[in-house]
Amino acid sequence: MYTKQSSAKIQELKSPALSIKIGYLDDDFRIFSLVSEEEREFQPHYHSFHKLLFFESGNVSYYVEGETYELQPFDLVLVPAGEVHRPVIHSSLPYRRLILYLSPAFFEAYKKESVDLFHSFSLCSARASHVLRFSDLLESRLYTPLQELSQ
């Protein structure tokens, strides 16, 4: 649950001295599945690329830029490049997710006057909501093709 106290803690974590840049991306995109089966603490961090995370299972909160989201299966988390984020795993249940990294150059290469693939990421900051909630896999038409690509 998001509280003023957790907001203050997140603002503290967003300090450049306390958040680190991690990960790298040598191509336009990278897609993979991850499972964390033990409790693990993730440090606040950011990337130079955009991150799309499909949450599959676990008991996880996700912090992005001062907001806390209690994830539910099939949630889609959008994290634009440069935004501080981290998951918090609340139990030893396996934390399963499908991750897609996208370079800023990827979006630029496909940008046209009538089409802006980056639009969904742009809305995150404007609406202060980084999670799209789907009730099932059928509602999320992106999940199945991405899962197939990750194998």
Language model features with spans:
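A hydrophobic/aromatic-rich effector-binding and dimerization subdomain
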Residues: 2-30, 88-150
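N-terminal regulatory/effector-sensing and dimerization cores
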Residues: 28-123
